[in-house]
Amino acid sequence: MKVIDQFKNKKVLVLGLAKSGESAARLLDKLGAIVTVNDGKPFEDNPAAQCLLEEGIKVITGGHPLELLDEEFALMVKNPGIPYNNPMIEKALAKGIPVLTEVELAYLISEAPIIGITGSNGKTTTTTMIGEVLTAAGQHGLLSGNIGYPASQVAQIATDKNTLVMELSSFQLMGVQEFHPEIAVITNLMPTHIDYHGLFEEYVAAKWNIQNKMAAADFLVLNFNQDLAKDLASKTEATVVPFSTLEKVDGAYLEDGQLYFRGEVVMAANEIGVPGSHNVENALATIAVAKLRGVDNQTIKETLSAFGGVKHRLQFVDDIKGVKFYNDSKSTNILATQKALSGFDNSKVVLIAGGLDRGNEFDELVPDITGLKKMVILGQSAERVKRAADKAGVAYVEATDIADATRKAYELATQGDVVLLSPANASWDMYANFEVRGDLFIDTVAELKE
C-alpha cells in the first residue's frame, strides 16, 4: 500500500464498527492517526471492539454520546449504514469536521488501479464478472467494497499488479471526496433506498459522486437503456462508454442475439453462463470494461460462459425430481424480479414473492407475472402482492415464512418446472437481511431432497 502521512498524529473518530469500521480503525492506526472508535453495541457483546481495545485503540461503546465531539477531531470515518441525520454526524458536520467512508481511505492508499461499480441492480454480479474476467486475463482482479470485503482492507494488500474492483453503494459514495477510479460503471438507476435518501434525486446524486474526480482520460460506463443515463452522460468530464440491449451504441450492445463491442462480435447472448435479460446487461457492462482494459474476446467469452452466478442473485440451488430451484433473494425491488422472470417460461414458474411492506403497490409487476403457473406469497406486503396476482389472473397460496413457502412451492411444481425465490421486497419484516432469507431457502431445498 501507499504510505501516506496526512493522518499522522491526527485525531480521527470512527463511528460504527461492522467490517468496514473495524478495517478503517486498524488502517488509520497503522497510518499513525490517534483513533477513537464509537459503536452503539455494548462492549460485552462487541467482539470487534474488544479486539481493537486489545490492540491499543480507544473504544467507546454502548451509545453515541454527543459530548464525544467536544474533542477536536480532524476527521470522522462513518459506517456507510449510518444515515446523515444521525445526531453525531449532524454535530460533526456543524463543527466542520469532514465525514468520510472507508472507501475514501482505500483510494488514498491503493497502489492498484481502481474500477468502481455502482447502480441499483446488478452491482454484485457485474463486479464479480469483471473481477473474474480481469483475473483470467492476468490482471488479478481483487473484489472489495459493498460485496463483503472492506475496501480499506483489500487496498492494503493490493499492488500495482492487481486491479481493485470495488462494488460501491450510494451510502459509501456519499462519503468520498478525492475518490478517483480509472473506470466507473453505473449499472442502472432506479428509485431504491428512498427511505435513506429522502428523494430519488438525492439518491442519484450520491451515485453520481463516483465520477466527481474523473477526467477525459477516465472511462464512465453507462446503461443507455435508460434515458436518465443518457441525460447524465453530458454532465461528466469522463469519456462515456455506453452499453445497451435496445440499440446500437458506441460501446457494448446486443444485436441479433450477439454481444458486440464497437462493431466487433464478442460472444452470443445465449452463451452467458447465467439466465435473464439483466445478466445480458451485466455482461455488456463487463465487456465494456474488459475491452477498455485490453482483454481479448476469447478470454471474455470463456469466462462469461463459465460464470456460475453469485449467491442469492438468480443462483441455481438444486434439481429435485426435475424441479429446478433458483435463489434470487437479492431481488428486493420490482425491477429485479421483472428481470429474473425474463429468463424463464412463466408457465413453468412457481414464484415465491413478498416481504417488507414499504407501501408501494405492485401493478408494474402484473405483466411480468401474467401466465405464471402459481405464486406463493408471504410477508408484510402479502396483501399488495395478492392484489397484483389477482389482476394478473395468477392463482396463489399463502405461506408463513420462507421454509413454508419453499415446501408449498415444491408441492405445486411438477417435473420441468422452476421454483423461483424472487421476492420483489426487502427481507427485514422477517429476516435480518436477504442473505439470511436466501440461506433458509437453500437449507429448505436441501431438506426436501433428503
Swiss-Prot record:
**Entry's family note:** Belongs to the MurCDEF family.
The keyword Cell cycle is annotated on this UniProt entry: yes
Gene of this entry: murD
Gene3D superfamilies per UniProt? Mur ligase, C-terminal domain, Mur-like, catalytic domain, NAD(P)-binding Rossmann-like Domain
Q: Which organism is it from?
A: Streptococcus pneumoniae (strain Taiwan19F-14)
| Catalysed reactions, semicolon-separated | UDP-N-acetyl-alpha-D-muramoyl-L-alanine + D-glutamate + ATP = UDP-N-acetyl-alpha-D-muramoyl-L-alanyl-D-glutamate + ADP + phosphate + H(+)
**Main localization (coarse):** cytoplasm
The biological processes this protein is annotated with in GO are:
cell division; cell wall organization; peptidoglycan biosynthetic process; regulation of cell shape
InterPro entries cross-referenced by the UniProt entry? Mur-like_cat_sf, Mur_ligase_C, Mur_ligase_C_dom_sf, Mur_ligase_cen, MurD
Q: Which GO terms describe its molecular function?
A: ATP binding; UDP-N-acetylmuramoylalanine-D-glutamate ligase activity
Keywords, comma-separated and alphabetical: ATP-binding, Cell cycle, Cell division, Cell shape, Cell wall biogenesis/degradation, Cytoplasm, Ligase, Nucleotide-binding, Peptidoglycan synthesis
Instruction: Quote the cellular component terms of the Gene Ontology held in the record.
Output: cytoplasm
Q: In which pathway does it act?
A: Cell wall biogenesis; peptidoglycan biosynthesis
Q: What is this protein called?
A: UDP-N-acetylmuramoylalanine--D-glutamate ligase
Q: Where in or outside the cell is it found? A: Cytoplasm
Has UniProt tagged this entry with the keyword Cell cycle? yes
* Assigned EC number: 6.3.2.9
Give me the residues that bind ATP, please. Answer: G119, S120, N121, G122, K123, T124, T125
According to its UniProt entry, what is the function of this protein? Cell wall formation. Catalyzes the addition of glutamate to the nucleotide precursor UDP-N-acetylmuramoyl-L-alanine (UMA).
